[in-house]
A protein has these predicted regions:
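Bacterial N-terminal signal peptides that target proteins for export
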Residues: 2-14
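Intrinsically disordered, low-complexity sequence elements enriched in Ser/Thr/Gly/Pro
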Residues: 5-7, 25, 89, 276, ...
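Bacterial N-terminal signal peptides
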Residues: 14-22
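N-terminal small/polar-rich segments of proteins
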Residues: 26-84, 114-239, 271, 279-399, ...
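A surface/secretory-pathway sequence property marking extracellular, secreted
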Residues: 78-108, 225-263, 389-416
């Protein structure tokens, strides 16, 4: 009898204990579904991140309703000093209790205020919710954002929103950035010559710097546009300047190219912007007029391979894979020639006895101005058959009375006697910009006596033509 009574008491005690456990299990343990990844694809498309049917607890829904609030004020970034996100960035909606949909499902933005997101019966079961994160209108920084999410059935302290670190190019730099030199005015100008804008576009969740360098060599390679035995001096990459700009103007300071990476961006880099897209960044390459004049006189193609690197700023302490892109700056100097005569009227006057006895000379400083990007010859000829008296066309003086030669100190000029046939005064001159020739026109005394003395008084005129031609 005593043994049976003890068994009954033990059974009763066990039943009461089980009942107590059921009654007091009102708030359960938080499930592991306490994180959302805001993927690159969503940020790029500016589409919502959806995470459905996330179990938050296995519990009896006390009072028949599911509520949520946050004991945090913001979603804080894991790196100190970085901007936070508002709690409302995360949207939450009650979903199911067990296999049954919650009633009165309501999506709410997370806030410090307790809000009902669904109702249901007092059944011991899994409770699930849907999460939604709109990506539009938010600047997403790589890293982890945390805030407390407090349900009346479970706590997520903290809840995580993770943003991957990425730099993804959205445009491909062209194989070459052409700079075309097809005018002597470019050599004479201060500005020189520039490339068209080279567009850079990329998406990113990290602050970025854009570096540029000469890829493999500190000098341009050169392919001449003419056949010559000339020795060409290599042109340094340092004559090439690059500037980064956006639609509002320059983004950083100009850099000179070398084989060392130099930043096109300000020291602090470029911040992540709304939409996380960096379009409309343009690189302009420039060579100043003085550098063109000193280094790019020879016609041909000057080529400098370059490398762009887009990387995270050193101060942003989350790793991101850098993006490199190769291009080439191609400077094409056209085959060009030009010749001009600043002084177009030359007078040799026979007004005294000594003019007839000693001859006459007219010296003209800067008589010829010439430019050529290829080797050249300069020829001279008369455009008329003789010097003709302006008052009497039958009165003439032979062309060959006149010698054209360089003034004292002027080198490289071959003297000629004027005729109607082209005669070369400069042979195979090297490419040059704005070379000035100091010439003199001379009628020696011997020619005066043989061809001029005794002629009718008056002005005798002839046209003289200077021509620049390829050798």
């Amino acid at each position: 009898m005593t043994l049976k009574l003890l068994k009954k008491k033990l059974y009763t005690a066990l039943s009461l204990l089980a009942c107590c456990l059921t009654v007091f299990s009102v708030k359960g343990q938080a499930n592991a579904n306490n994180a959302i990844t805001v993927a690159e694809a969503n940020i790029t498309a500016q589409s919502d991140v959806i995470s459905e049917d996330q179990v938050i607890a296995v519990v009896l829904l006390a009072g028949g309703k599911l509520t949520v609030k946050s004991t945090s004020s913001v979603f804080s970034h894991n790196l100190a000093g970085q901007p936070s996100l508002s709690l409302g960035t995360l949207r939450i909606k009650g979903k199911n209790i067990g296999s049954t949909a919650l009633s009165a499902q309501t999506e709410v933005p997370l806030s410090p205020l307790e809000q009902t997101i669904g109702t249901g019966g007092a059944v011991l079961a899994t409770i699930s919710v849907d999460y939604r994160v709109p990506t539009g209108g938010t600047i997403w920084l790589a890293g982890t954002y945390t805030a407390n999410v407090n349900y009346n059935v479970a706590n997520f302290t903290p809840f995580y929103m993770t943003v991957p670190a990425y730099i993804t190019a959205t445009s491909v730099v062209p194989a070459s950035a052409p700079i075309t030199i097809n005018s002597f005015g470019q050599f004479r100008s201060v500005a020189g010559a520039s490339s068209n804008n080279i567009s850079l576009g990329y998406n990113t969740t990290v602050p970025t710097v854009i570096d540029l360098k000469a890829k493999t060599s500190s000098t341009f390679t050169f392919t001449p546009g003419f056949t010559s035995s000339l020795t060409f001096t290599p042109v340094s990459s340092s004559v090439l300047k690059a500037t980064l700009s956006d639609p509002t103007g320059p983004v950083g300071s100009p850099i000179t190219l070398s084989t060392t990476d130099k930043s096109l961006t300000p020291p602090a880099g470029l911040p992540v912007i709304l939409t996380n897209k960096r379009p409309s960044l343009n690189t302009v390459f420039n060579i100043a007029g003085a550098d063109l004049l000193a280094n790019f006189v020879n016609a041909g193609i000057y080529k400098l391979p370059v490398t762009y690197t887009i990387a995270k700023t050193p101060a942003f302490n989350i790793a991101a894979t850098s993006k490199t892109m190769d291009s080439s700056v191609d400077v094409t100097v056209a085959n060009m020639m030009d010749i001009s005569l600043p002084t177009t009227t030359i007078a040799l006057n026979f007004t005294s006895q000594s003019n007839y006895s000693s001859g006459v000379t007219a010296a003209v400083t800067d008589q010829v101005m010439l430019s050529s990007t290829v080797p050249y010859n300069i020829t001279v000829k008369a455009g008329t058959s003789a010097f003709v008296n302006a008052s009497d066309a039958t009165a003439t003086i032979p062309l060959n009375v006149m010698t054209i030669e360089g003034m004292s100190g002027q080198s490289g000029i071959t003297p000629i006697q004027l005729s109607t046939s082209p005669q070369t005064i400069i042979t195979n001159g090297n490419p040059v910009i704005d070379r000035k020739l100091n010439l003199q026109y001379r009628i020696p005394s011997a020619k005066v006596l043989s061809a001029i003395f005794g002629k009718s008084p008056g002005n005798y005129n002839a046209t003289i033509i200077y021509t620049i031609v390829a050798p």
